Structure formats: structure tokens, C-alpha cells
């Protein structure tokens, strides 16, 4: 199955690296930070990029952005109208993958986990303060892909509203998880636990987005 999706996954990696490059350039800096003083160097910015880029480079199945692209392709094969071209769909894959990456960085901090994907967790490698700040920053980098979309203002506003709503749901799911960790004598019901998993995991794959891409 991996070989079947090789080209799609390569295109996804290209989109992710464009939004979060290992080395910055003036165009990316302007799009991400707008005007910066000359005293701000790439070394300063790397304190944000490296913890995030390092975790992404350790692997991950990329099934969230893969599903996003596959749904977009299904829409076209079914002859349905979609507000996004395939190229635009690739360009917004950071919306789901960056949220996932940021949540892993924060989750490892909150769980006091020492490893992630077989390597030291971000807060172990880079320090808690740097990892926490970088993870938070990545949540705000993702919607930059909405800013650059060539589409209607109404559709952009819809995407922004969807994105922020899903972030709120993600943090509610994490709050439920932390609550049970801090109260080991409390046992969640099946429905409660299922809801927590849905909020945390399902948030990175907004159902509304699939509906939009499939139904136009």
C-alpha cells in the first residue's frame, strides 16, 4: 500500500517542508512573521523550527494529510465540484499534520514522556521551555496556509472558523485525559473515554472538511 501512495506522500512532504523549512528564507519569514528587525536572526527562528521539524523527520504515517488528499481525489473522480484544486488541497495539508505534531510535543510534556518515535521527546532534546513554545507556535503556523489560498474570503473565513473550533475540541479532549491522569481513582465510562479519544484524535481530521471536499 505504501508504494501505491508514494507519489502522494512525497507531494505531502514537499508541502510540509514548504510551510516548515529546515532553513528559512526571506519569503518564508515575511509570510510567517511579516516585518522583522535585522537583529532577528535565523538562529533565533530555529528555536521554533527545530523541535517541530525534528519530530516530523522522525517519521509518522502522514495518514491525516493522506486522507485529506485522497478525499479530494475521490471528489474529482465522482464528478463533484470542490472549492479546492488538488494543488490547493496539498497546500493545506499542514493544517492537519502540524496540529498533530504540536499536540504530540505538548502531550509528551504533560505526560512526562521521555521518548517519542524511539527517540528522546522534544522537551528532553531541546528543553521544556523551548519545546513548549515551539509546539504552541506550530498551531499558529498551520493557518498560514489558509492566508495564501487563492479562493474567496468567505471560504477562508469558513476554514479559519473550522480550524479554531477543532483546536478548542482538541484541548478539551486533552483536558479530560489530564483530569483522569490526575485522579487515578476515577474511571471514565466507555462513552466518556470514547468521547475523549474522538476529541483528541478526531480533531486532526475534521469531518466537515471531508464533507466539504466530497460534496462540494
Language-model region placement:
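Hydrophobic alpha-helical core bundles mediating ligand binding, dimerization, or RNAP-core interactions
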Residues: 13-16, 20, 52, 138-139, ...
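Inter-helical turn/loop segments and adjacent helix faces that build the functional surface
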Residues: 74-85, 143-162, 177-178, 182-196, ...
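Well-ordered alpha-helical segments within folded domains of soluble proteins
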Residues: 63-69, 135-144, 203-210
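Divalent-cation-assisted or electrostatically stabilized phosphate/pyrophosphate-binding catalytic cores
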Residues: 116-138, 186-201
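Mid-bilayer segments of alpha-helical transmembrane spans in multi-pass integral membrane proteins
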Residues: 129, 133, 166, 170-174
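Active-site alpha-helical segments that house and flank conserved acidic catalytic motifs
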Residues: 87-113, 164-170, 202, 206, ...
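Conserved N-terminal diphosphate/IPP-binding helix and adjacent helical/loop segment
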Residues: 1-99, 105, 109-124, 175-188
Amino acid at each position: 500500500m505504501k508504494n501505491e501512495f508514494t507519489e502522494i506522500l512525497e507531494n505531502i512532504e514537499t508541502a510540509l517542508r514548504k510551510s516548515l523549512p529546515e532553513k528559512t528564507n526571506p519569503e518564508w519569514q515575511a509570510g510567517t512573521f511579516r516585518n522583522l528587525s535585522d537583529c532577528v536572526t535565523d538562529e533565533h527562528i530555529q528555536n521554533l523550527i527545530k523541535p517541530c521539524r525534528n519530530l516530523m523527520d522522525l517519521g509518522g504515517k502522514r495518514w491525516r494529510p493522506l486522507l485529506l488528499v485522497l478525499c479530494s481525489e475521490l471528489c474529482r473522480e465522482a464528478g463533484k465540484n470542490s472549492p479546492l484544486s488538488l494543488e490547493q488541497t496539498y497546500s493545506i495539508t499542514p493544517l492537519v499534520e502540524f496540529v498533530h505534531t504540536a499536540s504530540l510535543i505538548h502531550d509528551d510534556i504533560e505526560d512526562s514522556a521521555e521518548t517519542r518515535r524511539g527517540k528522546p521527546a522534544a522537551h528532553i532534546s531541546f528543553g521544556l521551555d523551548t519545546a513548549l513554545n515551539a509546539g504552541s507556535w506550530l498551531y499558529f503556523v498551520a493557518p498560514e496556509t489558509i492566508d495564501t489560498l487563492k479562493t474567496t474570503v468567505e471560504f477562508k473565513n469558513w476554514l479559519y472558523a473550522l480550524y479554531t473550533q477543532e483546536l478548542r475540541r482538541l484541548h478539551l479532549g486533552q483536558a479530560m485525559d489530564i483530569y483522569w491522569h490526575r485522579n487515578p481513582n476515577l474511571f471514565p465510562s466507555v462513552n466518556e473515554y470514547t468521547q475523549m479519544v474522538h476529541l483528541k484524535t478526531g480533531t486532526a481530521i475534521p469531518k466537515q472538511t471531508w464533507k466539504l471536499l466530497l460534496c462540494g
